[in-house]
Amino acid sequence: MPVPSKERVTELISDLVQRQGYDVEDVAVTLAGKHSAVRIMVDSDAGLELDAVANLSHEISEVFDSVSDFGESPYTLEVTSPGIDRPLTHERHWRRARGRKARIDLAHETVVGRIGALDGDSVAVVIGSRTGPDVRRIALADIQKAVVQVEFSKPDPRELELAGGIPEGRVAPADADASEDEEVVEGLDK
């Protein structure tokens, strides 16, 4: 019996993940002959800690074991946080990325700036210049694609101040980028 669909996996885990205070960001089911992989990306406003991801992985594994959807087919379960290269597609992504630098593609221009406060249907973006940083509001509907950028040096304190700082529980940009950009718990082969 094959591994269940992405939709079925999402249905099986959504309540559990939400009760633990996380959002299901994505589910990927990869069929590879007799052995398959189920990759689940989760996130929260406070970020993820490795121990919490490990516990969540074990609880998800128990849910999978309690249903017949997986049959006897072996699979690898991987629970991870979204990487830094995840596009910002939901309001919660923008909220969680406040204080981070992002590349924002609009219809006729590309803007690189520090993400500020989300206000209804627009986001504040702090754009650095020779004369100092300036804040520009951009309608979410006008954004074609936005991706957080890797930063290797500490952000300008004035830019961070104008952006509203770093959300509570999140790591400052250069500190986060210096470490791994994903936490992964692997090795739960069934």
Swiss-Prot record:
A Pfam family it matches: RimP_N
Acidic residues bias (residue ranges): 177-190
SUPFAM superfamilies to which the protein is assigned, alphabetical: YhbC-like, C-terminal domain, YhbC-like, N-terminal domain
Region (Disordered): 159-190
Localization annotation: Cytoplasm
InterPro entries recorded: Ribosome_maturation_RimP, RimP_C, RimP_C_sf, RimP_N, RimP_N_sf
PANTHER family: RIBOSOME MATURATION FACTOR RIMP
Record NCBIfam families: PRK00092.2-2 (NF000930)
HAMAP family per record: RimP
Protein name: Ribosome maturation factor RimP
GN (gene name): rimP
